[in-house]
Structure formats: structure tokens, C-alpha cells
């Protein structure tokens, strides 16, 4: 059964959300310089690349990333392709697609994924995102996990309403997916965030099987 790695590679030249720290990988011990082993130090924000948001990210309620439920982060999911002319994942856009019944984990493949396929490293502000009415639609539909193929589920400069609507409803948010090589359909999702105590988010190695 094929395995799709939908995780962005963490590197110093990858795009990050404006104001977040850039990725820095520094070698602090080197065999070439007489050390017993090569050792590196990695610095970056917890919302870098492919990552999950904990409720504490926007709700300030101390529900942090190490407590996210593994039974939601893993299991059957549906990858939904949206046409390139879809500029926002609104309630109307969602009503227009034929989402199969019983889907509780939903990943959106939009034109954003073409940015990853092309190797675009500059942060893009006009990415396809989920406005508030789309988030409310997902909550009504019973979605437990939503994944998007850029660095935020929310529109740029209007990030709070969507995040709050989803996180208050207990929806796990998975951001920064590369779905450029994934066809529409059902898969098994395995999303394992770093277990960082007290954190509002964490990077997550994420794969699809199927």
C-alpha cells in the first residue's frame, strides 16, 4: 500500500508566518573539529512547516499540544480536491462539493499545494483558507480534524475567527500540508506531533497510507 509523506521539510529557506522565527540549524559539535560526534541545534517556532494547533494557541485556556487526542490525529481521512478557481473555502464552496458521508477527518488540497510543488520559498499572503462561515460549516458537519495545505487554516490578517470557531468546538487543526502528489479520496492518516509540554502547537510528521 503506498505511503505519502505530506510533511514539509524543515529547512532554513522555508517560508514561515510573518513574525515567527526563521529556521536555524547550527552545528555545535563536529567530528571534523575533534568532537566525538556531530551534534546540531535546531531553533524554530512551533508553528513552522507541517504542524498542529492546540486550543491554547487562540483560546488561552491551557489546553496544550501534549494533550491532543491521538485517536483524532490518526485514522481514516478524506482528501478533498478543490478547483484552482476556489479562492476561499467558504460554506458555499463546501456545499457545492459532494463530500462522502461519515467523514470526520478532512484534508483540503487546493492550489496552495502547487506552491510546494514549485518550491516557492517566499511567504504568500493570498493563500486559500477557511473563513468563519466555512469553519462553522465544518463544525456543523461533525468534522473532528481539518487539514490545510498552507501555513494557516485562517485567511491572512483575519486569523482569529476561524481558529476560535474550530478550537472551541474541539476540532484539531493541522496546517502546512503538502498534498501536491495526493489524489482525492480516502486514506489512513497518521499525524504525530512532538509531545512538547505546555506548548500551543508542535511540528508533526504526517503521512497518508492508502
Which residues are covered by each model-predicted region?
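Active-/binding-site microenvironments in catalytic and ligand-binding cores
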Residues: 1-210
Amino acid at each position: 500500500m503506498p505511503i505519502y509523506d505530506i510533511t514539509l521539510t524543515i529547512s532554513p529557506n522555508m517560508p514561515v508566518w510573518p513574525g515567527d522565527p526563521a529556521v536555524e540549524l547550527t552545528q555545535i559539535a563536529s567530528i571534523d573539529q575533534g568532537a566525538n560526534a556531530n551534534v546540531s541545534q535546531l531553533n524554530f517556532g512551533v508553528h513552522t512547516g507541517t504542524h498542529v494547533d492546540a486550543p491554547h494557541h487562540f483560546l488561552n485556556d491551557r489546553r496544550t499540544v501534549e494533550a491532543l487526542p491521538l485517536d483524532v490525529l490518526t485514522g481514516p481521512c478524506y482528501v478533498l480536491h478543490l478547483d484552482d478557481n476556489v479562492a476561499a473555502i467558504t460554506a458555499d464552496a463546501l456545499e457545492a462539493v459532494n463530500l462522502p458521508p461519515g467523514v470526520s477527518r478532512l484534508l483540503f488540497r487546493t492550489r496552495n499545494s502547487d506552491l510546494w510543488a514549485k518550491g516557492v520559498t517566499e511567504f504568500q499572503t493570498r493563500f486559500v483558507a477557511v473563513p468563519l462561515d466555512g469553519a462553522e460549516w465544518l463544525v456543523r458537519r461533525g468534522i473532528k480534524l481539518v487539514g490545510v495545505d498552507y501555513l494557516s487554516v485562517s485567511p491572512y490578517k483575519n486569523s482569529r475567527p476561524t481558529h476560535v470557531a474550530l478550537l472551541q468546538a474541539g476540532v484539531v487543526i493541522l496546517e502546512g500540508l503538502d498534498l501536491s502528489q495526493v489524489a482525492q479520496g480516502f486514506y489512513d492518516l497518521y499525524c504525530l506531533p512532538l509531545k512538547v509540554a505546555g506548548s500551543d502547537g508542535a511540528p508533526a510528521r504526517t503521512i497518508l497510507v492508502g
